[in-house]
Amino acid sequence: MATVPTRSGSPRQLTTKQTGDAWEAQARRWLEGKGLRFIAANVNERGGEIDLIMREGRTTVFVEVRYRRSALYGGAAASVTRSKQHKLLQTARLWLARHNGSFDTVDCRFDVVAFTGNEVEWIKDAFNDHS
């Protein structure tokens, strides 16, 4: 778990949620620097969550953000399993429906922003509803 210095000078442990939020904020800034426009963060639908929803031109981009301290067990990108992909697809499907859209009517893709140590990897179109 990550630590952060407190005002008293002694470090305090960050919760998993706080650590995840920090990496998601970093991914958002990084993607905005690449020209994407922010739409939403931490979108919850039945049974799933999408870390970031961005826009690149006319494309809606659903982003999964992952962080791993090292690549010892395959790195951050390797942690996006088929099961996780299925949940993300279902969550995106529900979000699109709430916004009067579907995979058939909205140009969209699923990206992964993976932080492994100090390295960032942006995997565009990492998976889709036909995978």
UniProtKB/Swiss-Prot annotation:
Transmembrane segments: none annotated. Signal peptide: none annotated. Pfam families: UPF0102. One of its GO terms (molecular function) is nucleic acid binding. Residues 1-21 are annotated as: Disordered. Residues 1-19 have a biased composition (Polar residues). InterPro entries: Restrct_endonuc-II-like, tRNA_endonuc-like_dom_sf, UPF0102_YraN-like. Belongs to the UPF0102 family. This is UPF0102 protein YraN. It comes from Shigella sonnei (strain Ss046). The gene is yraN.
